[in-house]
């Protein structure tokens, strides 16, 4: 049983069923899974996807550990938990620079620059998540040290972030640029800075396959990645159609999604290959942020064996 999530399944049947977990329902790096699903691209490749949306990477990791997922879609920090024994391996670098993420503040906040966040409470999706890492990376890059800000787990749903802003449970939040752009329209919050203003090369999105799937059906992984890359090709060349679909999926106005599309479309990789610079950044971060005790051998955490030729 998978708890703390939302499930979407295609009504039809296909040759191979894959349960795909997403760490966030509306993350720009992950929503193309839903786009490809709705377009029938995965089905065309002989796959019947069951998409499970979680409210953070930790809950998704629990489902993977329990054997409930075949594929997980999250961020680069998920690889740290592979080093700690999570039974999966990263198989695709979805996105590089985290252009889809930013730091937002409540609409009535007096904060006008990132420098004013020193010592402040910053909302994150869950402990050990990519958003926690980015909050702590802000402190490190500003010279405040890894404890220069206080991460507060509030989830990554719009409702929970909105409530945290209105009740001033946090001074800021690491979340989707689109979310903050929409909040600005409603005077709930506003975008302070994009994460890319202080964080460069990093694997901001990855697919991982369960060890069970790797051992029992490696061809399904190859097929999934081929369908994914076909989906990204469509997203790149069909802005209007993509914006309309993602607007409905994210429940955001098309004008907001259109602006967000322009900011984020360049982050997707065209071949799923892992960037050495991004891996080096992750390796450093895993230790600095105490996800692991010693630097892991990154080559054991991912494989490019399933990439389409």
What do these predicted regions represent?
Residues 1-6:
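Bacterial N-terminal signal peptides
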Residues 9-11:
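N-terminal signal peptide c-region/cleavage motif recognized by signal peptidases
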Residues 16-157, 164, 171-177, 191-195, ...:
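Short, glycine-/small- and polar/acidic-enriched structural segments
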Residues 39-40, 62, 66, 89, ...:
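Solvent-exposed, polar/charged alpha-helical surfaces in well-ordered, non-transmembrane soluble domains
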Residues 77, 157-248:
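Pocket-lining segment of extracytoplasmic ligand-binding domains
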Residues 215-293:
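Secondary-structure end/capping motifs
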Residues 286-309:
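Conserved C-terminal helix/tail region of periplasmic/extracytoplasmic solute-binding proteins
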């Amino acid at each position: 049983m998978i708890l703390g999530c939302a499930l979407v399944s295609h009504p039809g049947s296909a040759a191979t069923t894959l349960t795909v977990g997403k760490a966030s329902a509306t993350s720009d790096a992950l929503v193309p899974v839903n786009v490809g699903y709705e377009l029938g691209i995965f089905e065309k490749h002989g796959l019947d996807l069951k998409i499970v949306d979680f409210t953070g990477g930790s809950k998704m990791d629990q489902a993977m550990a329990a054997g409930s997922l075949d594929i997980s879609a999250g961020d680069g920090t998920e690889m740290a938990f592979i080093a700690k024994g999570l039974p999966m391996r990263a198989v695709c670098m979805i996105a590089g620079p985290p252009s889809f993420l930013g730091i937002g503040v409540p609409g009535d906040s007096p904060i006008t620059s990132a420098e004013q966040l020193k010592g402040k409470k910053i909302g994150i999706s869950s402990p050990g998540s990519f958003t926690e890492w980015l909050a702590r990376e802000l402190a490190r890059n500003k010279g405040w040290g890894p404890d220069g800000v206080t991460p507060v787990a509030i989830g990554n749903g719009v409702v929970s972030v909105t409530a945290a802003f209105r009740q001033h449970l946090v001074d800021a939040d690491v979340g989707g640029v689109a979310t903050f752009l929409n909040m600005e329209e409603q005077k709930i919050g506003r975008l302070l800075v994009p994460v890319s203003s202080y964080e460069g090369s990093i694997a901001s999105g990855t697919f991982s396959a369960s060890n069970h799937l790797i051992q029992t059906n490696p061809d399904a992984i190859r097929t999934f990645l081929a369908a994914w890359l076909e989906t990204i090709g469509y997203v790149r060349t069909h802005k209007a159609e993509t914006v309309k679909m993602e607007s409905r999926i994210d429940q955001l106005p098309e004008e907001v999604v259109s602006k967000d599309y322009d900011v984020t479309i360049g982050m997707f990789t065209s071949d799923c290959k892992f960037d050495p610079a991004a891996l080096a950044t992750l390796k450093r971060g895993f230790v600095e942020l105490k996800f692991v005790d010693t630097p892991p051998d990154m080559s054991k955490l991912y494989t490019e064996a399933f990439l389409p030729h």
